[in-house]
């Protein structure tokens, strides 16, 4: 995503412009929200809307009311069913999770995941939930590499094995 500045014009990508003009039926003078994916949320006015071209003029930067002072990073082993992994990525983006890492374990049935597809799902969820920060999708790595490279202060592992359930305490 480009860096956005107030009082400048920005052209939406062909795909985004077509969606904005044809599907949402937006026209010149309509106001839209733009994000840079890094926490910036901007109000803009459409100044040109023709078929596959949409130009927006940024009017002002909006306050990020969802900003927090911590980072949430979730790792998961992709399931056999790709749709479940995509669903997880979508929900993570809607909840505002900062980063999702995929890992391969000794029980993994799927070791090849198209992160480009998950990134598209995340962008769609970002737009639908009016979030300003994009959820980063990291490529699949083995479990040991993931754990050894984790820089978070607190790390937790959740599992569905057995009937015993432990609760996180403060």
Regions found by a protein language model. Give the residues of each.
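N-terminal positively charged helical leader segments and presequences
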Residues: 1-63
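Short secondary-structure boundary/capping segments
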Residues: 1-2, 64-66, 147-148, 169-170
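A short acidic, often aromatic-flanked loop/helix-cap motif at beta-alpha or helix-coil junctions
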Residues: 4-5, 141-147, 163-166
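Short secondary-structure boundary segments
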Residues: 36, 104, 159-162
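Glycine/Thr-rich phosphate-binding loops of Rossmann-like dinucleotide-binding domains
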Residues: 42, 110, 166
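Non-catalytic surface loops within mature trypsin-like serine protease
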Residues: 48, 60, 78-80, 162
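RNA substrate-binding interface of SAM-dependent RNA methyltransferases
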Residues: 65-157
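Active-site/ligand-binding-proximal alpha/beta "capping" segment
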Residues: 155-170
């Amino acid at each position: 995503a480009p860096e956005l500045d107030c009082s400048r014009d920005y052209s939406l990508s062909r795909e985004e412009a077509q969606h904005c003009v044809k599907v949402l039926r937006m026209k010149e003078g309509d106001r839209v929200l733009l994000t840079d994916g890094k926490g910036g949320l901007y109000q803009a006015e459409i100044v040109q809307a023709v078929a596959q071209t949409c130009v927006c003029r940024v009017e002002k930067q909006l306050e990020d009311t969802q900003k927090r002072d911590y980072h949430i990073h979730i790792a998961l082993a992709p399931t056999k069913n790709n749709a479940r992994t995509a669903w997880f990525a979508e929900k993570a983006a809607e909840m505002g999770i900062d980063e999702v890492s995929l890992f391969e374990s000794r029980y993994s049935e799927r070791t090849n995941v198209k992160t480009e597809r998950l990134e598209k799902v995340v962008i769609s969820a970002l737009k639908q939930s009016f979030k300003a920060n994009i959820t980063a999708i990291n490529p699949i790595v083995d479990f040991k590499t993931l754990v050894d490279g984790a820089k978070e202060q607190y790390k937790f592992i959740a599992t569905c094995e057995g009937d015993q359930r432990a609760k996180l305490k403060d």
